[in-house]
Amino acid sequence: MQFKNTPQRYGVVSAALHWLTALVVYGMFALGLWMVTLSYYDGWYHQAPEIHKSIGMLLMMALIVRIIWRLYSPPPIALTSYSRLTRAGAAAGHLLLYLLLFAIIISGYLISTADGKPISVFGWFEIPATLTDAGAQADIAGTLHLWFAWSLVIISLSHGVIALKHHFIDKDDTLKRMTGMSSSDYGAQK
């Protein structure tokens, strides 16, 4: 597998960032669902949110790297089997996934810094609080964070189902290209 993307397939960096993001998103979603079940006297009550915040800030950095990488190493050319509607739907779906990722991280940041305190990322460094208002900010951002999380999980699951549909029903190379396999069916614009 090549380092950079080619017209036929994704490179190792893009594939690693894609799968790592997916694992982190589902792990963070599970952690978030578990955190809200903890009682004040549970040993993880204070520790779990700190882990959640730290991973969230690292995910933000990874997303920035991912976007820079995407500009440096553009994705493979669309398969010839894709209709114009399929290409437009894929572009819209990917944009929505990126927007939701940033929205969920920003809303999480606003929850975490509403009290004016910075976010400590595993004790390595701190992300300063910029916008602070301990009252409404935390409540509004918390509601948005919840909705963004559910939306992201539902849309990313749809993304996965669509990739599987391409692989098993359409029998095209969509999924293969994200796993490092090359495609000969690329480049035409319908």
Set out the residue ranges of the language-model regions:
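Membrane-embedded alpha-helical bundles that constitute the cytochrome b-like, heme-associated redox core
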Residues: M1-K190
